[in-house]
Design a protein with these regions (language model features):
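Catalytic phosphate/metal-binding cores of nucleic-acid and nucleotide-processing enzymes, i.e., regions
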Residues: 1-134
Length: 134
């Protein structure tokens, strides 16, 4: 299954002295490209995720810390930090989509309730017309 999460930029900060690698990912969920974009409002997720922009962009950071007894390997540290940052990014994106889904389901339920009410009113009015035409 394909997701719409795209990492537009990756930055690393390596601290050899403390054996730490920090990875920063610039993430784009590409909301404007989604088929439901015309129905999506930032209000659906802004309260829970204020750091996500209107278009679905956000930044995540993660670090990899080497054990003091182990030998520091920058390449492995970068891979671990990037992987941890991606876990955060996909977690945030999934929870953002969950907020959007809940909001849209609530709207669909309200639309369905209104539809049922209109259908009932139509039946009542049809019966009223029949009675008036007798």
């Amino acid at each position: 299954m394909k997701n719409s999460v795209h990492v537009s930029k990756t930055e690393y900060h390596v601290d050899r002295e403390n054996k730490v690698v920090l990875c920063t990912l610039y993430v784009d969920t590409q909301l404007p490209k989604h088929p439901a974009w015309v129905s999506i409002s930032q209000d659906f997720f802004a309260k829970r995720f204020p750091f996500i922009s209107y278009g679905g962009e956000f930044i995540v950071k993660a670090k990899a810390r080497c054990n003091k007894e182990d030998e520091f390997d920058e390449v492995v540290g970068k891979r671990i930090a990037e992987s941890r940052a991606k876990v955060k990014a996909f977690s945030i994106a999934a929870r953002m989509w969950e907020c959007i889904t809940r909001a849209m389901n609530a709207f669909a339920l309200q639309c369905n309730t209104t539809m049922v009410a209109c259908a009932k009113a139509e039946i009542i009015e049809r019966e009223h017309v029949k009675e008036l035409c007798k």
